[in-house]
Amino acid sequence: MAESKIYMDLHNYTKKYNIIYADPPWSFKTYSDKGKGRSADNHYPVMNIEDIKNLPIQHIVGDDCVLFIWVTFPLLKEGIEVLESWGFTYKTIGFNWVKRNKISDSWFWGLGYWTRSNSEICLLGTKGNPKRISAGVHQIVDDRIMKHSKKPDTVRQRIVELCGDLPRIELFAREKPDGWDVWGNEV
């Protein structure tokens, strides 16, 4: 994917952020016709790993910054590579979203590569020496699935509780939540 205007405009940002929350539009291989209808590229434009790695994130990263980046388990290795290419050190899984169906309280089961998948993880990486404000933030997020790839709103609240009311931006955002700057082609 060539750098479109939306991605190049990160070069023009002058504000530095202490919290970056990202849900990249990962491209990944489907192995069956059944999986193709549910893949991300049927719902929005996706990016390959190299293009995600090469985003000019360094223009917006503060000296002491925490990155939260969503990744699926099949792309865990690539997710850590992206985190590191953006200048962060992997620390832990910040959040593990255990998914329930839209209507019932039963578990949601994706197709998966080997086993039927359910949860999605949000990696946590740091740059500099950011501080944890609260020790009471839990990793497990038990919430319903919504429209394709939309993450639970509670995660943003937990991030602020964990890190404090610091300058923050959501990358690849689909909406503009209060208190957050946003960037992406769906806002």
Predicted feature descriptions by range:
Residues 1-187:
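Class I S-adenosyl-L-methionine-dependent methyltransferase catalytic core
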